[in-house]
Amino acid sequence: MLTKGITLILLLVLVHSSHGDSTPNRKFYIPSIRANWFKANEFCNSLKMRLVAIRSQEDNDAVARYVRTTSKFTDNCSFWIGASDLADEGTFVWVATGEEVTYTNWRENEPNNEGGNEDCIQLAYIPALNYHWSWNDNTCAGQSLYFICESVECDCVQPF
C-alpha cells in the first residue's frame, strides 16, 4: 500500500513539473508602430490587451519564439515589455497587475538606471552587443520601440 501511495505522489509530481507553471492561454501581438513605453502601454490597453509580462524563462523563450516568426525580428531588435520601476526606484512591477517582478533576464550590468531615469524594461536581441533576449532598463519616454502586447484569459472572480 505504501509503495502505491509513493508511486501516486511521484506520478503527480512528474505530471505537474512537465506542465511547468500553470499559465493562462496567451496571445502575443506586435503592432506595426513604434512608440515610447507610455504610448505602447496605452496602445495595448486600447486593444483590450496589455504589455507582455514575462514571469519565467519559459515565458521569455515563448516570447522570443513568437518574435522570431514576425517581420520585426532582426539581428538588432528591441521591444518594450510591461514592467517598470516608476513607482519605486529599483522595484520593478508588472504594471498591468501590480505584481513585483520576480523572474528577470537582465543583461550583464543591468539594470543600471543610467542617467538616473531608466525606469522601463525592454527585451532585446542584439548579438553584437551581447543581448540574447535579455533585458535592459531604458528611459520610458526617450525611445520609440516596437512593443509586445498580450491577451490573457481573465482569472478574475465571476459575478453570481
UniProtKB/Swiss-Prot annotation:
InterPro entries: C-type_lectin-like, C-type_lectin-like/link_sf, C-type_lectin/snaclec_domain, CTDL_fold
Cysteine pairs bridged by disulfides in the record: 44-140, 120-140
Tissue specificity as recorded in UniProt: Female salivary gland (at protein level).
Induction trigger: (Microbial infection) Up-regulated in salivary gland following infection with West Nile virus (at protein level). Up-regulated in hemolymph and midgut following infection with West Nile virus.
Pfam family, one: Lectin_C
UniProt xrefs under Gene3D superfamilies: Mannose-Binding Protein A, subunit A
Residues glycosylated per entry: 76
Record domain C-type lectin: where: 23-140
Signal peptide: 1-20
Record carries keyword Secreted: yes
Keywords of this entry: Disulfide bond, Glycoprotein, Host-virus interaction, Lectin, Secreted, Signal
Any one GO CC term of the record: extracellular region
GO MF annotation terms: carbohydrate binding
Glycoprotein is among the record's keywords: yes
Disruption phenotype annotation: (Microbial infection) RNAi-mediated knockdown results in reduced West Nile virus infection levels.
Subcellular location: Secreted
Highest taxon in the source lineage: Eukaryota
Any further remark recorded for this protein: Antisera against the protein added to infectious blood meal blocks the interaction between mosGCTL-1 and envelope protein E of West Nile virus and reduces West Nile virus infection after feeding.
PANTHER family from the UniProt entry: MANNOSE, PHOSPHOLIPASE, LECTIN RECEPTOR RELATED (PTHR22803)
Assembly and interaction partners: Interacts with putative receptor-type tyrosine-protein phosphatase mosPTP-1; the interaction probably mediates the recruitment of West Nile virus particles in complex with C-type lectin mosGCTL-1 to the cell surface. (Microbial infection) Interacts with envelope protein E and virions of West Nile virus in a calcium-dependent manner.
Function of the molecule: Putative lectin.
Name used for this protein in its record: C-type lectin mosGCTL-1
Organism: Aedes aegypti (Yellowfever mosquito)
